[in-house]
Amino acid sequence: MLSLRKTIASLVRNRGRWEKLLRAARRAPAPGAGAVPIRLQEAHGFGSNPGNLRMFSYVPAGLKTPAPLIVVLHGCKQRAATFARDAGWLDLAESTKAVLVLPEQKGVNPFWYDVAWVAPLVGLLGANNQNACFNWFQPDDAAHDRGEALSIAQMIAAMIARYPVDPGRVYIAGLSAGGAMTAAMLAAYPERFAGGAIVAGVPYGCADTVIRALDCMNPGVDRKPEEWRQAD
């Protein structure tokens, strides 16, 4: 008890000091405040774009020598710009002089996310997926030269044609639905990528409908390696 009383007494004595420090911390500018925000460039006319995706990119200033290209795929209910910033991709591109291409899914207004009666109206609202998820579970969007997969491949080709990008150093990474689409891209275009990273995604070929996609995520699907190899 003596130790507890001493601890409480010490906290009381130093209360004013801690309050001053906290007030100073609240007044201090956030890290990076005042710096010019890094903006992504939206590109048009990069191909036939059968998947109806938006294309954003970031190219470090003064890039002259062939640079690596990283394809970054966001998760559901996310946007390319916020994912690139919050996940540190823009900082990585600046520090390593890597070029980024950031496909963005067309979802409905965030106000309508998860609203059941909106689902049948997604196409009429100009969206591909209600919650802005990449359609990794749709065969017409996740196969070689089909839909969203082909749109992403066209973005890569456009970046290689327009900027000093090393074709031998093209990488892809994605989170959640973006991770699942990353798996699809690696399976559909293995010759295109030097490597990839799947974060919280699912294996390619796990689902071909929305219902099966939900099963892949929970409770999950367990298959033998040879069964996954045969998935299409």
Model-identified regions with their sequence ranges:
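Alpha/beta-hydrolase
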Residues: 71-73, 103, 199
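Active-site glycine-rich loops that stabilize anionic/oxyanionic intermediates
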Residues: 75-79
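Short, solvent-exposed loop/turn and secondary-structure capping segments
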Residues: 80-86, 111-115, 129-135, 184-185, ...
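Gly/Ser-rich "nucleophile elbow"/oxyanion-hole loop immediately N-terminal to the catalytic nucleophile
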Residues: 61-65, 115-123, 129-177, 187, ...
